[in-house]
Amino acid sequence: MAKSVRSSKKKVKRVVTDAVAHIYSSFNNTIVTITDRQGNALSWATSGGSGFRGSRKSTPFAAQVAAERAADMALEYGVKNVDVLVKGPGSGRDSAVRALNAKNLKVTSITDVTPLPHNGCRPPKKRRV
């Protein structure tokens, strides 16, 4: 008796033209995630995952490289327009937005969504070096 051959369907990449770029920039690292309007992740990259280690992760150049890597993966989905949501106090905020703009992604809006406490938790004590 002949074995039945199962044909697998090839996964079709969906086309997303409008996306949201979430840039989280801390003092130690920068995370860039590009999602569709519903929040489903299309691509992401970090400055640590881009080959930077230690104090070099927190530089603006590392954030630029991470944003370029995330943009390259998002361009495969057909992304053209990007709303940018920036969160955190880090140094890679501006350079990541510029890198997205340089990759032919039209930045339609830039919004700062850094959470600000209405005097909630007590902050950590100040460093004495």
Curated annotation (Swiss-Prot):
One of its GO terms (cellular component) is ribosome. One of its GO terms (molecular function) is structural constituent of ribosome. GO terms for biological process: translation. The keyword Transport does not apply. It holds the Pfam family Ribosomal_S11. Keywords: Ribonucleoprotein, Ribosomal protein, RNA-binding, rRNA-binding. InterPro entries: Ribosomal_uS11 (IPR001971), Ribosomal_uS11_bac-type (IPR019981), Ribosomal_uS11_CS (IPR018102), Ribosomal_uS11_sf (IPR036967). Located on the platform of the 30S subunit, it bridges several disparate RNA helices of the 16S rRNA. Forms part of the Shine-Dalgarno cleft in the 70S ribosome. Belongs to the universal ribosomal protein uS11 family. NCBIfam families: PRK05309.1, uS11_bact. Part of the 30S ribosomal subunit. Interacts with proteins S7 and S18. Binds to IF-3. This is Small ribosomal subunit protein uS11. The gene is rpsK.
